[in-house]
A protein has these predicted regions:
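Gly/Ser/Thr-rich phosphate-binding loop
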Residues: 1-92, 105, 199
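Ser/Thr-glycine-rich phosphate-binding loops at phosphate-binding pockets of nucleotides
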Residues: 2, 76-80, 154, 179, ...
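Short Gly/Pro-enriched turn/cap motifs at secondary-structure boundaries
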Residues: 95-100, 146-149
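Conserved ATP-binding/catalytic segment of the ANL
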Residues: 112-119, 123-178, 213
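C-terminal boundary motif of the adenylate-forming
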Residues: 155-157, 175, 196-226, 266, ...
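Conserved C-terminal "lid"/linker of ANL adenylate-forming enzymes
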Residues: 176, 203-206, 215, 256-318
């Protein structure tokens, strides 16, 4: 028995320890040069920051996690007055928004209203004294979101983890259904694409300008102007305007390569989630045009404004 234990330790020890020994010096160096200074700016009494009002970008969440700054993400809606849950300060779990507050019930259901078990993705529903009675003088809208037994349908896709924490997975109305029947949530794909230094914003589509389902995904991409111009200078790409530069073949190939390196099986994406084609746009999104007052992207407005580009993406030869 002792020999078996020694063999077990001898096998796993280098596998577990060596990666830690390689990473730890880098972590200490980062802490000394950068992270420690960031934490010092927040003061000695800082315990945690709060994020809310919109989806908390995964790249920012990971950054503060690495820095050692605790950010607790909250989730709620106006219809739930408004807070449903908050990521705990003690033992927070990345990407989770915490367990429901006292007095609030949550469940996840499928498209037929059947309650799903733990770790199954579906639509998040809420019940409790915090939930509204209905929309003022709009029984038609109330009927769409309230069940007969008092559950409010948030329209958000979520998973309940084994420890009863909520993990948001996107908006149900944003779900893309391809011609092959594949269901795709665009937000995780866009969030990953937007981690590229060369990309400011991206919008993923699976329908053409007539809102007809297609066989593959495409994306509208807004380049990061400063990074693209630096790249052009380093690579001696001549241009007379940013519009000309952004739409040049060299920049298009750069952005396509960036997206291909991010959206692939190595990063957990399926083959049908890859971006088949892109169209480059150069006008930043504005509140009241492509963005809501809460800075949230209005996909239907983007689709309408750039319907000509969507038509080209789905009609030009592959």
């Amino acid at each position: 028995c002792s020999s078996d234990l020694n063999d077990f330790i001898g096998f796993w020890w280098p596998i577990l320890v060596w990666p830690w020994l390689l990473v730890y010096p880098l972590k200490m160096l980062g802490n000394l040069l950068v992270f420690k200074k960031i934490r010092a700016m927040l003061g000695k009494n800082f315990r945690a920051g709060i994020a809310g009002g919109g989806a908390y970008p995964d790249v920012i969440d990971k950054f503060f996690w690495a820095v050692g700054v605790n950010i607790v993400e909250g989730y709620g809606l106006t219809e739930t007055a408004p807070i449903i849950c908050v990521r705990p300060i003690v033992d927070p779990i990345l990407r989770n928004v915490g367990s429901p507050l006292r007095g609030i019930q949550v469940r996840v259901v499928d498209d037929d209203g059947i309650i799903l078990g733990k770790c199954k993705k579906g639509t998040l529903q809420i019940k409790g004294n915090c939930v509204m009675q209905g929309y003022y003088k709009r029984p038609d809208l109330t009927e769409k979101v309230m069940t007969v037994d008092g559950w409010f349908d948030t329209g958000d896709l979520a998973v309940l983890t084994v420890n009863n924490e909520i993990q948001l997975r996107g908006r149900k109305k944003d779900t893309i259904v391809l011609m092959g029947g594949e269901n795709i949530e665009p937000l995780p794909i866009e969030s990953k694409i937007n981690t590229s230094r060369y990309i400011s914003t991206s919008v993923v589509f699976g329908t053409n300008e007539k809102h007809e389902d297609q066989r593959y995904l495409v994306a509208l991409v807004l380049p990061n102007k400063d990074e693209i111009e630096d790249y052009a200078a380093d690579n001696k790409i001549e241009h007379s305007s940013f519009e000309e530069l952004a739409n040049s073949e060299a920049i298009k190939k750069l952005l396509e390569h960036e997206i291909a390196e991010l959206i692939n099986s190595k990063n957990g994406f399926k083959a049908f989630e890859r971006i088949n084609k892109i169209a480059i746009i150069t006008k930043p999104f504005e509140v009241g045009v492509e963005l809501s007052a809460k800075q949230e992207m209005m996909r239907y407005r983007v689709a309408e404004l750039y319907k000509d580009k969507l038509r080209e993406l789905y009609t030009e030869s592959k």
